[in-house]
């Protein structure tokens, strides 16, 4: 396993501006012998505008890192957490499952998008200078390396360590006779009735293989005729991925099915069987127009998604060549897209193993507390959130501050309050048993005006969002689906309340989805406020989303696609002016993805002028830090851990009057051009200081993180020069909350 590197070990080649101008990232052709957060098909071309040059020389070619390579590097960081022996054991299994799930989505969306561009002849070079075919070949080679490392980590490291702790992941041949007998009974009663063997012969065409399904390719022989036949058995996805043969011993469900194939093909000889798994293009393409019912259009597209073309075939490395040739031929997939792996395939099944109740093998339990400004002192009664917000704004930092006693309680109190007249809410992703949805339904049924903007195009949550949209409509909520051609990704909630002779607006602007379950796992920020300017801004924005308002300027918001990119770029340029005048200047950015070329170029310009630029990014980063003459004043860091870093923050020195924004937008074309996104300006000085401290701590050399070098390589910094562990910022925040439950500062 690659050990964490100390700072002293992080030696990167320092390309000059001149060398970068002639540089194009190396591509590696896939070597095949006989035979990967926030992903989007965001493949727009970019040309530096004259305005962005700010009077300086044009920036060099080759200044952008390839985003697909960068995404694969992000998933490699996930894999490094699984490989790290200091990660709790069941969390290592969980990171293996996350890596596999991430890679599934990467192939379904990004690889599928590249193949579509190649097939349609849209061969525009990416900002990194690569043609789609070159990018695809790099992905095939790099993902093959990472998948091999992933399998090795499971087989050689995590599985043996689990066995030492009494959690045995075994194959059928390793089971005792009594265990096999028990599983045969389970097979007869619970598995056999739902299996459907499908033969392939002149009367039975090759069956449809659904995306991400696990399948058995079976070869049988008719003992009468001696003819060999191929059949396919799909492993039902509703069955548990690992079955408990006896306490602490788990076997893959496909092994149990394979051991009893004679039951499915009576009178035939089962000669061989091999597991395979297919990944298909599952990116949605919904053509919208003003007259179309978006709900119906999306439902039709979800049906078409099942038939997307194949983009990856995983097979057990022991697969028979004749069987593999048949699969490749019938599935119409290229040899370069075949990935032979040691079984078991589909290690997303390790999510099931992670759920085993062994707390000593997981991260220590953390229960979020109620934010101090919302908690009733020495009282068991529910806090009056509206009264608290009339006193001061509340800056929330989840999961360290409880979502259920803040944002959820805010909406539940609004639903039950007879003085509340209206609630307006965006929903991008929410849970199946959502108390947020329940509160909105309760409000509508009690006669309140409820507007819900449901983004039914949130990838891979479309079916759930359709379901909740209908449920909300049936209860009397006004449900709208946003603006044609734009996804609504902003996280907004507005409550209008009658208070005496006046109406007061209470608002929530956040970085995360209104999803109580993920709020315990995702790091996010949110601002609760009764500020009239924010309330007026949210009213205007909701009117734009539900009606025909064309308002594009706001008081305390920056809103994409009109003002957000330009607003941030102009503020970065203003830092250059402050720096030249000798005033305090800095740019600090925390995002999931840093890809947008205009924003990256603005950071380069700031660096060239001497402005320090810090970028804290979880996933993709196209920016090259540390290049002399271009970006020597830019640092890029990444933090991964038990919580998924999801907040977006933008902080500027602003000549000594700090300006800080938080909201939903990542620095990607899709967010800035094809989504409704919103950032809110944070005005409370204590909140601004708290957010700047958060950014400083995340970027500190004393914090465990990955550092990005100018060559695009990420280096893990987990120990100091003496080999002592660096501080973990997430654990530091947990400890702070345990010491002083719920404070105003993250």
From Swiss-Prot:
The active site is at 489 (phosphohistidine intermediate). Residues 1-17 have a biased composition (Polar residues). Disulfide bonds: none annotated. Residues 1-60 are annotated as: Disordered. Mg(2+) binds at residues 429, 459. It is an enzyme of class 2 (transferase). GO terms for biological process: polyphosphate biosynthetic process. GO terms for cellular component: membrane; polyphosphate kinase complex. Its EC number is 2.7.4.1. InterPro entries: PP_kinase, PP_kinase_C_1, PP_kinase_middle, PP_kinase_middle_dom_sf, PPK_C_dom2, PPK_N_dom, PPK_N_dom_sf. An intermediate of this reaction is the autophosphorylated ppk in which a phosphate is covalently linked to a histidine residue through a N-P bond. Its cofactor is Mg(2+). Keywords: ATP-binding, Kinase, Magnesium, Metal-binding, Nucleotide-binding, Phosphoprotein, Transferase. SUPFAM superfamilies: Phospholipase D/nuclease, PHP14-like, PPK N-terminal domain-like. Pfam families: PP_kinase, PP_kinase_C, PP_kinase_C_1, PP_kinase_N. ATP binds at residues 102, 522, 618, 646. It catalyses: [phosphate](n) + ATP = [phosphate](n+1) + ADP. GO terms for molecular function: ATP binding; metal ion binding; polyphosphate kinase activity. Residues 37-53 have a biased composition (Acidic residues). PANTHER family: POLYPHOSPHATE KINASE (PTHR30218:SF0). Belongs to the polyphosphate kinase 1 (PPK1) family. Catalyzes the reversible transfer of the terminal phosphate of ATP to form a long-chain polyphosphate (polyP). This is Polyphosphate kinase. It comes from Streptomyces coelicolor (strain ATCC BAA-471 / A3(2) / M145).
